[in-house]
Amino acid sequence: MIMSGAALRASASAREASQGRRSSLTRSRVRSAWIFIAPTLVVLLLIAGWPLARTIWFSFTDASLNSLNDYEFIGFENYLANYDGEWLGLLTDPDWWRSVWNTVWFTAVSVSIETVLGTIVALILNASFPGRGIMRAIVLIPWAIPTVVSARMWNWMLHDQFGVINDLLLRLGIIAAPITWTANPDTALWAVVMVDVWKTTPFMALLILAALQMLPGDIYEAAKVDGVHPVKVFFRVTLPLIRPALLVAVIFRALDALRVFDLIYVLTSNSRDTMSMSVYARQQLVDFQEVGLGSAASTLIFLIIALLVVVAMVAGQVRLSGETR
């Protein structure tokens, strides 16, 4: 049946009216969303945006902790400057680059181990067994303990004279003499990684467990009926399905690891062999009272983290919503 011109015009008018109502509803929802989110944005600007802007500004000055109101604008001299043919500044400081390497190494190793262990723990906790709820609560205890408390606790456990770790290894005959875990350059950073893995693996397990619980159960029933090996089910079914959530968890955890401060500072203080970028910035700002140089280090930390976030999101092709492109 062929529609008349009047009917076509009426149909088009109805579609336009419907689209207009949807557009008006969308605009209303957007306005409501902005109204609700505006207070949060204002608070974020006050507690995060303003300090960040001040830090970036101070990085271009010669401000010191003794005279925060008496400083001069010096441009990029805190970052890189040439005086009588000699290059000076943050980018020429070997301690800065050592702290960058320590931070990147710590992040890569700790996040990798935590992701693997967190996945294993999440798979175990996702299974059905008696006392599963209690076990889930127990697993979260290390993550719930404040970082400083965890670091002090492990500092005593790793003590070369009174620590339980050395005592146990000596009794088992694994070592012949006590090891200075946090003072030895060969073991200090590994000790920090070990403590961080103990504390943060439950966090990764929690995020991965949440992703596992959202998976449909019928695919596993089908795999069980077909007699597919559980290992193959994990790599062919489970891992691809939780990949977006896993990538988001890795990004969030890497962000946290890149700004590590308290764990390293409590365990090893200002040791050059374990100094992170945040510890270096604190040393310049507090110990040396160089606000300009400390602010420059903090600004570079911000830029490095921001760059790595962009790279990770592009490489993993993951949106913050957890959907892959």
Please annotate each region the language model reported:
Residues 1-27:
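Short, Lys/Arg-rich, polar N-terminal cytosolic tail immediately upstream
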Residues 29-325:
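A structural signal for multi-pass alpha-helical bundles of membrane permease subunits
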